[in-house]
Curated annotation (Swiss-Prot):
Repressor is among the record's keywords: yes
Regulation: Binding of a wide range of cationic hydrophobic compounds to SCO4008 causes a decrease in DNA-binding, probably via allosteric conformational change of SCO4008.
Domain notes: Contains an N-terminal DNA-binding domain and a C-terminal dimerization domain.
Physiological role: Probably regulates the expression of its own gene and the adjacent SCO4007 gene by binding to two operator sites in the SCO4007-SCO4008 intergenic region.
Induction: Autoregulated.
Annotation: DNA-binding region: 30-49
The organism's place on the tree of life at top rank: Bacteria
Sample GO molecular function, one term: DNA binding
Name of the molecule in the record: HTH-type transcriptional repressor SCO4008
Domain HTH tetR-type, chain residue ranges per copy: 7-67
Record's keyword terms, sorted: DNA-binding, Repressor, Transcription, Transcription regulation
Length: 192
């Protein structure tokens, strides 16, 4: 019999949960499918994470932390930051799908672990505010609003790929053109 490796099992559960939640949302996800994909016992998932909602929250928290580490907000190089953000989401579209599902499921209701999420975004807003205070980017738009606008521009094409395809085309030319337009728009929004 092979030795059990709890960390490897947790990693398989995590990856299976990311795929399941990105595909089906919180309500539509099934622990049975996650367990089968992860080659793990269903009871083990509950032991590790408590319930499906906690598993979703754990998955989303870890994916958001990965983004924050991989693509920190950079007010000194907005176009470069937008480029890196677009690249990240092209390589990891599941994060935006998870956030979209979360929005559909919770709407304006308070999220589980909302205080931690607010801290996460407060750090990003602080980076934007720092750029404003140093005169690198405009302070005509409040820092939280500015961050929201920039992130929305960069993320929307991944959230609704059908609209991107319909409006700008599905090939590389459409994608490259949209990327350039997003960067130009971002630069104009932040210019002093």
């Amino acid at each position: 019999m092979a030795a059990r490796d709890p960390e490897a099992t947790k990693a398989r559960i995590f990856e299976a949960a990311v795929a399941e939640f990105a595909r089906h949302g919180i309500a539509g996800a099934r622990i049975d499918r996650i367990a089968a994909e992860a080659r793990a016992n269903k009871q083990l998932i509950y032991a590790y994470y408590g319930n499906k909602g906690e598993l979703f929250a754990s998955v989303l928290e870890k994916k958001m932390l990965d983004l924050a580490i991989s693509v920190p907000v950079d007010p000194d190089d907005i176009e470069g930051w937008i480029d890196r953000l677009l690249d990240y989401h092209a390589a990891h579209p599941e994060l935006l799908r998870l956030l979209f599902w979360e929005g559909m499921e919770y709407g304006t209701a308070e999220l589980p672990h909302e205080a931690e999420r607010q801290e996460h975004y407060a750090r990003k807003v602080a980076a934007v505010r720092d750029g404003q205070e140093r005169g690198v980017i405009t302070d005509a738009i409040p820092a939280p609003d500015l961050l929201f606008l920039l992130v929305a521009m960069a993320n929307w094409a991944v959230v609704v790929p059908q609209m991107k395809r319909i409006l700008v085309g599905g090939g590389d030319a459409g994608t490259d053109g949209l990327r350039d337009s997003i960067k130009k728009a971002a630069r104009r929004i932040v210019d002093r």
